[in-house]
Amino acid sequence: MLILISPAKTLDYQSPLTTTRYTLPELLDNSQQLIHEARKLTPPQISSLMRISDKLAGINAARFHDWQPDFTPENARQAILAFKGDVYTGLQAETFSEDDFDFAQQHLRMLSGLYGVLRPLDLMQPYRLEMGIRLENARGKDLYQFWGDIITNKLNEALAAQGDNVVINLASDEYFKSVKPKKLNAEIIKPVFLDEKNGKFKIISFYAKKARGLMSRFIIENRLTKPEQLTGFNSEGYFFDEASSSNGELVFKRYEQR
């Protein structure tokens, strides 16, 4: 099974590292091409393109400028320990054992606007470049055109390496759109997380993102290899609802705390 998750805007390059092991991203030649395009942007252009404040635009212009292709533990950090958004709050990779990191390295992939596909221990220099951003480049008008089949091909390599054909899609729609399902050599399973609000179950973004991290952790900690094992997920009050689920979609619900 190959788990797909989105990256995070919030980054952490300060906390103590829980592993010193690392690998290097496999698509850095592509990343360098995007950095070349991003360096052409002024901070005001970055602010407009990314819809972020002038202060954040300045920070990210500096990140693009400082980015260099030689990744070391001194200028980069393992991706799974660098991302710090809601998904990663649920994942809690900072508490992983070395065996957990081993399993995650084989079975978890982070989709990325700049790096394409990241393995958990791949070193990553700080950046902000969301997949949905319309950054014109030599291959087209946006990042979806830039990456084309590259991300899908890399995922197929990972699936072949583990002798498996199941993808657990825990990524957001914005990021999964960079994958070509018809060219992916896999059955795609999408867990959906619904929280009760005023008597009705619906997707609440913050909770759903955290739940994607919780599910990823559940798979990694328990070394799950078959999609039917996911139905045992019960972290933080979620339960599997078979009646609402279908072949490709596993629905998990949680009652409102009263």
Curated annotation (Swiss-Prot):
Family per similarity comment: Belongs to the UPF0246 family.
GO process annotations (BP): response to hydroperoxide
The species this protein was found in: Escherichia coli O6:H1 (strain CFT073 / ATCC 700928 / UPEC)
Gene: yaaA
Signal peptide segment: none
Cellular component, GO, one term: cytosol
Name of this chain's protein: UPF0246 protein YaaA
InterPro entries: YaaA (IPR005583)
Superkingdom per UniProt: Bacteria
Annotated NCBIfam families: PRK02101.1-1, PRK02101.1-3
